[in-house]
Amino acid sequence: GTFDKGDKPLAGVMVTDGMNVVKTNKKGRFSLPGFEKTRFISMTTPARFETQQFYLPVKENRKSYDFLLTESERTQPREHSFVQITDTEVTGGMGRWVTDLQQYVKNEKPAFLIHTGDICYEPGLKMHNQVVNAETMNCPVYYCIGNHDLVKGNYGEELYESIYGPTWYSFDIGNIHYVVTPIDHGD
């Protein structure tokens, strides 16, 4: 990988192609053996850090996948809270719940917010990405695919992945390793 001035490599960061998992070396580098169905290279965001992008889409001629991590006090505490939401269907629009959620997050200051599925088909997937994200919530936001998020295509999760990235991933907060996995089937 390449580093900007002042950036330092980080050893021990877990990186995966969806099948294989490796750790970065002391120079912050990694090598994956290759998995032909890989759609993303993603990393486990380590405790003490935040990132704007924990995954990168695989591109045919791309040889390097670099992730930018910034230190964050929010993801360090051993004891922390998080906000979990689910089934926030958007029939008739977002309504007042988004404003209420923003206020709740502002008051409680959770380490992160996670949406555990049923973002609700194409309209919901697109709308949530615009209104429930790290910038609008002022904390890291993670998404997990639900059965109402699988839409027609070669893979039911194609639209979800084009907006939110891989359906399998993990991150660390304090001394807890969180693993996000998809449901096994849709409607």
Regions found by a protein language model. Give the residues of each.
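Structural motif
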Residues: 1-11
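Cofactor-binding loop segments of dinucleotide-utilizing enzymes, especially the Rossmann-like FAD-
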Residues: 1-2, 87, 118, 146, ...
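Extracellular/periplasmic catalytic domains that process cell-envelope and extracellular macromolecules
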Residues: 9, 34, 75-78, 106-107, ...
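Short, acidic Ser/Thr/Gly-rich low-complexity loop/linker segments typical of extracellular
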Residues: 9-11, 16-33
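Short, solvent-exposed loop/turn elements at domain surfaces
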Residues: 24, 91-95, 151, 187
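N-terminal active-site segment of His-dependent metallophosphoesterases
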Residues: 35-127
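Extended active-site neighborhood of metal-dependent phosphoesterases/phosphodiesterases
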Residues: 44-57, 61, 126-187
